Structures are given as C-alpha cells and as structure tokens.
Amino acid sequence: MEREILAYIKQNRMIGKNDVVLAGVSGGSDSMAMLRILKELQGKLDFTLRVVHIHHGIRGKEADRDQSFVENICRKWQIPCTVYCYDVPGLSREWKLGEEETGRIVRKEAFQREAAVCGRKDSEIKIALAHNQEDLAETMLHNLCRGTGLRGLCTMRPVDGELSLIHISEPTRQEAIS
C-alpha cells in the first residue's frame, strides 16, 4: 500500500522537497495509519513531519487517553507533537453554533497556529488529514442532501485550500488498518 500512496502523493503533487507536513492525528485507526505511512515516506520525499492533536473537550477520559496515546507514539517515533485543547461545548454555546461547526473552526485555528510556529511560507506547509473511501462517500451523500452544487459533489480533493490541505484518501478503512 505504501507504494500506491507514494505514487498518489507524487501524481497529485501533494508534498514537495523541504515542505513541512502537519499531520492531524486523532489516535483513531485512519489517522494512525496515515501517520505511519507519512513516517515511512519522510525519507523518500525529504519533508519535515509534525503532528497536531486537537483535544475538543467533548469525550472526557476517552479523549484524554487518545491524547496520551498520540503523544506516546510521537515520542517513540521521534515526531514533534503539539496538542491544542479547546472547550468545544462551551464555545458552541458562546458562539451559538453546533459542536460540529465549532469543531471545524477550532481545528482550522489550531492548524493556522501551528503553521505560524513553523516560520515557513504557506506554500511550504501542508496539512495532512486521513480520510478513507467510506468517509468520501459519506461526505458526498451529506453534501447531496444539503443541495450542493457540482463542487460539493466532488467531495474532498487531494490538495485543497489555503495551506494545501492534503487528504490521504485512497485506501478503504479495512486497507488502512491492515
């Protein structure tokens, strides 16, 4: 699978030499598979890898365990890791938004803060998020129900947005965990 993902990254010009890749890692199987693959590809593509973990303040002890797990793996694999903590339920009430929307806002803020710490041009900073084919299908159906246009039906593109948002999206969930 690593060979296919390397080809996919090169074909879509997702990571360039000397880029900084900020990997969003939740501790779930998809993001851990992505992190393992990025760690393996780091030497082949010559980029700097950093992990961003976001504690949303929603799932209590379970979220605390996810944070510890991610921090321990990063320490073991010698990958710099920054944890951003937010009180998403409190912010949702304050901002009068749903928790899902508030979560999107704080995640974007966390990546912008981490990108600023890197001291590089935006074009040299990539944000990697793990999505599998099931996630893509779910996003497409959600967008269709919302009455989206053609752009929304395209779901998640491999590289998108201000800081080159990377979606590692080729494997299915089963392939990612095997």
Residue ranges, per PLM feature:
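Single conserved hydrophobic/aromatic residue that forms the stacking wall/gate
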Residues: 166-178
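Core alpha/beta nucleotide-donor-binding catalytic domains of modification enzymes
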Residues: 1-25, 29-165, 169
